[in-house]
Amino acid sequence: MPRRREVPKREILPDPKYHNIELAKFVNVLMTRGKKSVAEQIIYGALNHLEKKTGKDPVEVFTQALSNIRPVVEVKSRRVGGANYQVPVEVRSIRRSALAMRWLRDAARKRSEKSMDLRLASELLEASENRGAAIKKREEVHRMAESNKAFSHFRF
């Protein structure tokens, strides 16, 4: 571990339209090459599509989708006596959100719809209903942790 002082967490301001901090974080996750306005347009477009499709509050659908994607446990490699073991560990809350946002972004990028806002909207809708590629990724991580439960005594 570094011996320098601990780096403070930067405060992220809520997004300008919906005043939601998680949306602002997701804008930063989606942003490429510093083009924040493009990322905001994609997200707001996706939320508009969601509102038209479902008739529900789009921010509510977004938070429901994220909470469905968040992993509880994951595996970490631990070397013991010349062998590598996949040790299941609980995921900290900040990392849970970060992983969920990354998985959501990657799943939306892999979809076949025409524009990114349509891809993101349909992935958000599926994730809020507990299906889709991002949910599949979470289930895969949970399955890995479950199958390696025998090595959970190798704590970090």
From Swiss-Prot:
Gene3D superfamilies: Ribosomal protein S7 domain
A single cellular component GO annotation: small ribosomal subunit
Record carries keyword Cell membrane: no
Pfam families associated with the record: Ribosomal_S7
InterPro entries referenced in this protein's UniProt entry, alphabetically: Ribosomal_uS7, Ribosomal_uS7_bac/org-type, Ribosomal_uS7_CS, Ribosomal_uS7_dom, Ribosomal_uS7_dom_sf
Gene Ontology molecular-function annotations: rRNA binding; structural constituent of ribosome; tRNA binding
UniProt GO BP: translation
Keywords: Ribonucleoprotein, Ribosomal protein, RNA-binding, rRNA-binding, tRNA-binding
Xref: PANTHER family: RIBOSOMAL PROTEIN S7
NCBIfam families: rpsG_bact (TIGR01029)
Function: One of the primary rRNA binding proteins, it binds directly to 16S rRNA where it nucleates assembly of the head domain of the 30S subunit. Is located at the subunit interface close to the decoding center, probably blocks exit of the E-site tRNA.
Subunit composition and interactions: Part of the 30S ribosomal subunit. Contacts proteins S9 and S11.
Protein name (Swiss-Prot/TrEMBL): Small ribosomal subunit protein uS7
Source organism of the structure: Nitrosomonas europaea (strain ATCC 19718 / CIP 103999 / KCTC 2705 / NBRC 14298)
